Each structure stands twice: as structure tokens, then as C-alpha cells.
């Protein structure tokens, strides 16, 4: 049952081929037998089984929704009443929120079973999931390699078939990059499509929640459940949400694909370039029109992103002072010492680095030179992408310049870690939707293909990804069945 699609699982549960309790227990057993992946920070086994029993009663009565009785995992930065919300940080190691995030409420309303909360880079800052207070997550394809970050636990849980699907967050590539490294599908929705209420903030103008699953078809089913306006989120978009599962089944014709030459640079591994070119050829054979495009501002994507992201992080993380909530130092005799020591002890090195960087670019002598300038460049990047997307349906390229690297290989070189997001940050800067889907292997390691589309074009984006997956089997590959 672990290799069923979500639609197949839903049908089997509704037809009583197996019970939600059996499915949930199977997932719990898988998690327990794969503890070395370190994908989870917390589990809620007893409650999950209770909810599975309730789901079985609903299903027995011929009721239930598409996700009723299906277990899932949640990145540990979404607030939950029952489980701690740690953000993989010592600062919040014992924090329990008094409310559920909107996305959690929506899953409960749709009958999904939250089995636990997944490991991540601390406060979602990282590209390898090595920055966690609870230890590194390992890649199911090679346990000596990283799963990507910051949503590495969610990606590893899905890739390792521990759960049918999981939720992550994406600030600069934190859904798409782990999806690529772990050989699964993941989508960053348009900014504002999915509520951020109850999602602990890293960079508020960039953060967006989204799902991981094996296929675009599964992503469509999940996205339909979580998308929609939320009055509790001031950035939430008030739009009619289409039925993505229906939309992806419509005929896909006259696809216009933008192919940027700058995505095929020497630093992009040859195996990845070859896999992307093979995907382009397949799209051509399926009738797509390939249009070469020029992204003149692409060299500015990463520096622009890190100035803005660090600035927002330094502001958002100023609330953790050891007084209101979070870690409180026991070695302080004055208020200043309490705040200083609590933050020094509570935050890890990468979080401290980004807070310092953000504070620097926001300081009076550098605000105009760095932060204000980066915001102007951000607008130019957004305008360039929107202009190009007026003439093509999607921009296609590799999700990452490399396949998954070894644990410890880049942990002491933050610049190399940041460059793992070189192709993904633009979607966040512009608020655009983007999806990563599997498109091959290099040395038995998965390769990801990224498609970026217009604002609120998730239906088209998912349809194109689904169209590709109907003609390939990369998304069906399983790390447990490697030769």
C-alpha cells in the first residue's frame, strides 16, 4: 500500500480494501524501522491511531473526503496544539503553541491524520538539513548524503515511503530543492495562495507552505485541500480555488516552454544538464514549443535574496528574547545578560549568521546601500520574469546545480550552501508558483526538473508536470528498490 498514489489510497480506504488503522500502523512501523533517517522530531502515534479509528467509522458509513484516513507529516514550524513546535531549534525545544495553524485545521477538517512533525534546518535556514538542533536528516537514496533543506525531514519521509505525503515550507527553495535531492515532487504555490497563519516566520515576504508527494497528481489533491483565503493571514489572496485534481486531467496542448541558457552553466553537473535536455526533447516530441529566453538578471538572484531574507529574519527572530517564550538562560544576573545569553545559547550558528547579516544590512549606514537596493532589484527581477511569462507558459530548468552532496561536505562553507538555491530563489522573490519533479538519475542520485509559472497558474503548472509524468516513470522510482 505504501506505493499507492493518494487517489488509489483514497479509493482503497473508501472501498474498505484496508482500514485507516492498518495504513496508519504501517506508517508508524516504517518510521520506527527507519529511525536512522532522523526524519521526525516528534510522533503522535496514539492520537494518530485514535483518529484512524474515527476515520474508519466515517468511511464505513460511506462518508469521508478524499484525504479521510490518510496519514501525513508536518514540517515542525507549523503550530499545533498537541505537539511541540520546535523549528528544530533549542530556542523552541519545549514550546507548545496554544492554537493550530490554519493549514493544520484544514487537514483535520478534511480527515487527514497528522502522524508527526518532521525535522528541518533550524528556523528553516539551510539547504542541507544539517542545521537542526535534533541532528541531521539523511537522504533515503544514500544515507551518507543530505536530503536538501530546509524541509529535509518532510522530503525524506515521503521519499522513504514513511508517509504518503508531507507538508513543508519554501522561502528560497526549501520545498523544491529537497524534492529534487530526494527524487519526489514538490510545489511552492503562489505567494498568498496558502495561509501562513500559524507558520513560524523566517522571511515573511518570501515564506510559503506547500506539499511533498510522489507525483503531480498527488500534489493537486493536497493543494486543493490547503489553498484558499484566510482572514487570519493579511497576505492571503481572496480567489476562487479550482479543483486541481480535475484541472490536471484536461488535455494539455500548445505548451510554450521558456528555456534559459543561463541555467546551463559549467557549475551545473553534466548529468543534470543532460537530463534536462532529455526532458526538453520529450516535451518537444509531445508537441511543446521550446523558446530560448534570456534572464539578464539571473546573476543577481542569490545576492538579492539573501540580503532581503536575512533582513527579514533578523526582524522576525528578535521576538526570541528569553522572556516571553522560548529558551531562557540560567546564567544571567541582569536583563541584558538574560537576553544576550538566551539568544546565544538558543540559536545555532547558521541562524546567528543570518541574524547578524540581516542586522548589518538594516543598520543606518548600510540600509540604502544593501536593503533598499535589494528591494529595487527584487522588483526588477519580478518584472523581468512576469514579462517573459507573458510569452511562455513555464520557465523550465534544473531545480539544483548538483545532486545531493555528502553530509558535512559544505557545512563549513555557507556560500556553497547558499548557491544550492541558485535556480529556486527567483520564484520566491517574485511570488511565483514553481514545481520540482523527478527527471532522472546521476550516479544513482535523483535529479529534479523545475517548472516556474505565472501567478496563480498552479492548475496549468500541475497539468504540465502531470503530462510529463504520464510519459515518464522517474516519479515511480523507489530508494528501497535500488539495484
Curated annotation (Swiss-Prot):
GO terms for cellular component: glutamyl-tRNA(Gln) amidotransferase complex. It is an enzyme of class 6 (ligase). It comes from the Bacteria. The keyword ATP-binding applies. Keywords: ATP-binding, Ligase, Nucleotide-binding, Protein biosynthesis. Its EC number is 6.3.5.7. It catalyses: L-glutamyl-tRNA(Gln) + L-glutamine + ATP + H2O = L-glutaminyl-tRNA(Gln) + L-glutamate + ADP + phosphate + H(+). GO terms for molecular function: ATP binding; glutaminyl-tRNA synthase (glutamine-hydrolyzing) activity. The keyword Glycoprotein does not apply. Gene3D superfamilies: Amidase signature (AS) domain. The active site is at residues 75, 150, 174. GO terms for biological process: translation. Belongs to the amidase family. GatA subfamily. Allows the formation of correctly charged Gln-tRNA(Gln) through the transamidation of misacylated Glu-tRNA(Gln) in organisms which lack glutaminyl-tRNA synthetase. The reaction takes place in the presence of glutamine and ATP through an activated gamma-phospho-Glu-tRNA(Gln). Heterotrimer of A, B and C subunits. This is Glutamyl-tRNA(Gln) amidotransferase subunit A. The gene is gatA.
Amino acid at each position: 500500500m505504501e506505493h499507492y498514489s493518494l487517489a488509489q489510497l483514497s479509493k482503497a480506504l473508501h472501498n474498505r480494501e484496508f482500514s485507516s488503522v492498518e495504513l496508519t500502523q504501517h506508517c508508524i512501523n516504517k518510521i520506527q524501522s527507519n529511525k536512522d533517517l532522523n526524519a521526525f522530531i516528534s510522533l503522535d502515534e496514539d492520537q494518530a491511531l485514535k483518529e484512524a479509528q474515527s476515520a474508519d467509522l466515517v468511511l464505513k458509513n460511506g462518508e469521508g473526503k478524499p484525504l479521510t484516513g490518510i496519514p501525513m507529516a508536518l514540517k515542525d514550524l507549523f503550530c499545533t496544539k498537541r505537539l511541540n513546535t520546535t523549528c528544530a531549534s533549542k530556542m523552541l525545544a519545549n514550546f507548545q503553541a496554544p492554537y493550530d495553524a490554519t493549514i493544520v485545521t484544514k487537514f483535520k477538517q478534511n480527515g487527514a491524520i497528522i502522524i508527526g512533525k518532521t525535522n528541518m534546518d533550524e528556523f528553516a535556514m539551510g539547504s542541507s538539513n544539517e542545521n537542526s538542533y535534533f541532528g541531521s536528516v539523511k537522504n533515503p537514496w544514500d544515507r551518507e548524503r543530505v536530503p536538501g533543506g530546509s524541509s529535509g525531514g518532510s522530503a525524506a519521509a515521503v521519499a522513504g515511503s514513511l508517509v504518503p505525503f508531507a507538508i513543508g515550507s519554501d522561502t528560497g527553495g526549501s520545498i523544491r530543492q529537497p524534492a529534487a535531492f530526494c527524487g519526489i515532487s514538490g510545489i511552492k504555490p503562489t505567494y498568498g495562495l496558502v495561509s501562513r497563519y500559524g507558520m513560524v516566520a523566517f522571511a515573511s515576504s518570501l515564506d510559503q507552505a506547500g506539499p511533498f508527494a510522489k507525483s503531480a497528481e498527488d500534489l493537486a489533491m493536497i493543494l486543493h485541500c490547503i489553498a484558499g483565503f484566510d482572514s487570519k493571514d493579511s497576505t492571503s489572496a481572496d480567489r476562487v480555488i479550482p479543483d486541481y485534481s480535475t484541472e490536471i486531467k484536461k488535455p494539455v496542448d500548445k505548451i510554450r516552454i521558456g528555456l534559459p541558457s543561463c541555467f546551463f552553466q559549467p557549475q551545473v553537473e553534466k548529468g543534470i544538464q543532460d537530463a534536462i535536455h532529455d526532458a526538453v526533447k520529450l516535451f518537444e516530441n509531445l508537441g511543446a514549443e521550446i523558446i530560448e529566453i534570456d534572464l539578464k538578471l539571473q546573476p543577481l538572484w542569490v545576492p538579492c535574496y539573501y540580503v532581503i531574507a536575512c533582513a527579514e529574519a533578523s526582524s522576525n527572530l528578535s521576538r526570541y528574547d528569553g522572556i516571553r517564550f522560548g529558551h531562557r538562560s540560567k546564567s544571567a544576573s541582569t536583563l541584558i545578560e538574560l537576553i544576550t545569553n538566551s539568544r546565544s545559547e538558543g540559536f545555532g550558528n547558521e541562524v546567528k549568521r543570518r541574524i547578524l547579516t540581516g542586522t548589518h544590512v538594516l543598520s543606518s549606514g548600510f540600509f540604502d546601500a544593501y536593503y533598499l537596493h535589494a528591494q529595487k532589484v527584487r522588483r526588477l527581477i519580478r518584472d523581468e520574469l512576469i514579462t517573459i511569462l507573458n510569452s511562455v507558459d513555464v520557465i523550465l530548468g534544473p531545480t539544483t546545480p548538483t545532486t545531493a552532496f555528502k553530509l558535512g561536505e559544505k557545512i563549513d562553507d555557507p556560500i556553497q550552501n547558499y548557491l544550492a538555491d541558485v535556480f529556486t530563489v527567483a520564484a520566491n522573490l517574485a511570488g511565483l508558483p514553481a514545481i520540482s519533479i523527478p527527471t532522472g538519475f546521476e550516479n544513482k542520485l535523483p535529479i529534479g526538473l523545475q517548472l516556474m509559472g505565472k501567478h496563480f497558474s498552479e492548475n496549468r503548472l500541475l497539468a504540465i508536470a502531470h503530462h510529463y509524468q504520464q510519459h515518464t516513470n522517474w516519479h515511480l522510482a523507489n530508494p528501497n528498490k535500488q539495484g
